[in-house]
Amino acid sequence: STRVRSSAASDVYKRQIHPRVRKDFTVWVERQEKCEIVGMESAILYEAGFQDTVDAVIMVYAPVELRIQRAMYRDGASEEQVRARIAAQMDDEEKRRRADFTVVNDGVQLLIPQLNRIVEQLKTEKFIL
């Protein structure tokens, strides 16, 4: 079936691509000598096993309908395509439980004050090596 082929292709993709992404990220981080903080953006951080590559995880949360609208606008994707991508990802509540910090990006709460608090906490709690 198409689903089985898709799953098999996905497994091959994960085995080949994720190690390369991890290696490229590690090399990139090593080149950022003058940066106090560096970040990795990944919608599938936990699914790809990248949580062990970072010192702290900041989950950016937005209501699902807002995420769908933003992704449709940004990517030119259909609602069905975006919903399928979201369905393939870990549940938001599970991500929130696992994350060290959460930023709410709902268009109402201000982002910069949230990020400033997190950066200060990272410095204070010695997440930064």
Indicate residue ranges for each PLM-predicted region.
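Single conserved hydrophobic/aromatic residue that forms the stacking wall/gate
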Residues: 1-9
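Hydrophobic/aromatic residues within well-ordered alpha-helical segments
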Residues: 17-21, 118
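A short, charged, Gly/Pro-tolerant segment at domain boundaries
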Residues: 124-129
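Short, well-ordered alpha-helix to beta-strand connector turns
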Residues: 9, 35, 54, 99-100
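ATP-dependent NMP and nucleoside kinases share a basic, alpha-helical "lid"
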Residues: 23-74
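Active-site loops and adjacent core secondary-structure elements that bind or stabilize anionic groups
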Residues: 12
